[in-house]
Structure formats: C-alpha cells, structure tokens
Amino acid sequence: EFTDTQGVMGMHYARHDGEDEEVAVALNEQYMPRFAGDELPKSLVASAVALADKFDTLTGIFGIGQAPKGSADPFALRRAALGALRIIVEKNLPLDLEDLVKKSAALFGDKLANQNVVADVVDFMLGRFRAWYQDEGIAVDVIQAVLARRPTRPADFDARVRAVSHFRTLDSAEALAAANKRVSNILAKADAAIGEINLTVCVEQAEKALAEAVLALRTEVQPLIEQGDYTTVLDKLANLRAPVDSFFDNVMVNAEDPALRQNRLAILNTLQGLFLQVADISVLQ
C-alpha cells in the first residue's frame, strides 16, 4: 500500500534490530533502480541483493509462462531486466547472464514449467539492450551487429557496442561493411569445408598481400580480444580496407583450380572471422 516506503522500512527495522549498516542499507537499495534514470545501489552487497531479486523475478515469471506480451508487462519485467543490465554494465561487473539465470532457475527446482527459461530470459534481457542504446542515440544497425554475436556478458556487450559505434565513424567502415556482406555471401555458397590459409598456394600479389595481412592481424589482435579492447581491434582491422579492395579488384575467388579456390576461400574465412570476434559488421548500413 505504501510503495514509496519500499525498502525504507526494512532498512529502519534492520537498524533497530542491530544489523550491520551495510545490511540495512542493502535492504533499501535492493529495489534500485526503481525507474528509468534512477540511481543504482552504491555498495557491492546492495548490488548483489538487487541482482538476486531481479533475476529471481525474471526467472520465476518466465518459468511459469508469464512473459510480457505486447505492451502489457504486469510484473514490470522490462524494468527489472533493464535495472539488472544497468547495474552490471555501469559497475563493470564480470557477470554472465546465462550463468546467473541458470543459477536462479536451479533454485526453483522442478517448479518451472518452461523448459527454455534460461534462453528465454537471456534473449529478453539482450532485447532490452536495444531499447537502452536507442535511447542513447546509438544506431540500430550497431546494436544488431553486436546482437548477431549474442555475447551474454553485459559489460562485454557494452564494450562491443561502443567499439562498433566508433568503427562506424571511420572512413573505411562503409567499404569494409560492404566487403563483409560480399564475403558472407561467397562463404555461404562454399561446397566444402574451408581449411587454413596456405601462403605457398597464393599466385596473385593481391591475394598474398591480403593473406599475409589477415594472418598478421589474427596474431596481433588476439591479446586485445582477450582484454576486451574491441575499439583498438576494430581500429587495426580498419587498415584492411586497401588489401581487401585490391583482392576483390584483382582476384577471382572461384578459380578453376580447386586448391587455389579453397585457399582463397580460406583467406576470406579468416578475414570474416577477425571481424566476427567483435561483431557482424556486415549488417552495418
């Protein structure tokens, strides 16, 4: 009945009962953020309680088949999801949505009728990223490029979005996005498994140049990928524009010689793989 006092009375009761101040404050802050733009819990203890509460609600309601439909959201699950994402991202917590939902679902035992509850909750939460970033003015295609890779660690998801948003401003972005679309179409038609690049098979200067460039970059960016420094990764990959353009201008991928054709497909497969470690930039407009 007194929604404005949610958490407040619990805090005062805890203080009255002699609980630690951190516990008392956490009882109040577990409901944060209460609305869009509201402040977050200040301590990690309060953040942990807030996340536990939100994931328990999301998993339980999805588990009984009561996911939001259309504009109806009687259990405020959209707010709970966005609140959880904000806490994880803005506090840069190394948490994975799948791990959290699995742990939450396990606590319900066999009481959840929805057998796909983990995937459903994770997909729902990733979908809330779209609304969040659109409110920030980030282009929809940037969000889609990251969603295509389905990273489930929110802080990592955010780092990818920031990196792709930056990449989109570079002079080479449009050409490389178009090239990646072309590469995707070519690889989709490959009729055999694609192996590794063999430099000794290269005959054209343009294909050798691209092969050497992607192999060098694969080694160079790996530590950056592991560090989550996606902006630097894409800055380095942007340098591929010239060799990529030269490759498509001077090399016929579907050569008659099977070994030559497979090696050229391997070059393109490696090129695509470099970008896919961050996002699917082929969806950029």
From Swiss-Prot:
<dbReference type="InterPro" id="IPR015944">
    <property type="entry name" value="Gly-tRNA-synth_bsu"/>
</dbReference>
<keyword id="KW-0547">Nucleotide-binding</keyword>
<dbReference type="GO" id="GO:0005829">
    <property type="term" value="C:cytosol"/>
</dbReference>
<keyword id="KW-0436">Ligase</keyword>
<dbReference type="GO" id="GO:0006420">
    <property type="term" value="P:arginyl-tRNA aminoacylation"/>
</dbReference>
<comment type="subunit">
    <text>Tetramer of two alpha and two beta subunits.</text>
</comment>
<dbReference type="Pfam" id="PF02092">
    <property type="entry name" value="tRNA_synt_2f"/>
</dbReference>
<dbReference type="InterPro" id="IPR008909">
    <property type="entry name" value="DALR_anticod-bd"/>
</dbReference>
<keyword id="KW-0030">Aminoacyl-tRNA synthetase</keyword>
<dbReference type="GO" id="GO:0004820">
    <property type="term" value="F:glycine-tRNA ligase activity"/>
</dbReference>
<dbReference type="InterPro" id="IPR006194">
    <property type="entry name" value="Gly-tRNA-synth_heterodimer"/>
</dbReference>
<dbReference type="GO" id="GO:0005524">
    <property type="term" value="F:ATP binding"/>
</dbReference>
<dbReference type="Pfam" id="PF05746">
    <property type="entry name" value="DALR_1"/>
</dbReference>
<dbReference type="GO" id="GO:0004814">
    <property type="term" value="F:arginine-tRNA ligase activity"/>
</dbReference>
<comment type="similarity">
    <text>Belongs to the class-II aminoacyl-tRNA synthetase family.</text>
</comment>
<protein>
    <recommendedName>
        <fullName>Glycine--tRNA ligase beta subunit</fullName>
        <ecNumber>6.1.1.14</ecNumber>
    </recommendedName>
</protein>
<dbReference type="GO" id="GO:0006426">
    <property type="term" value="P:glycyl-tRNA aminoacylation"/>
</dbReference>
<keyword id="KW-0648">Protein biosynthesis</keyword>
<keyword id="KW-0067">ATP-binding</keyword>
<keyword id="KW-0963">Cytoplasm</keyword>
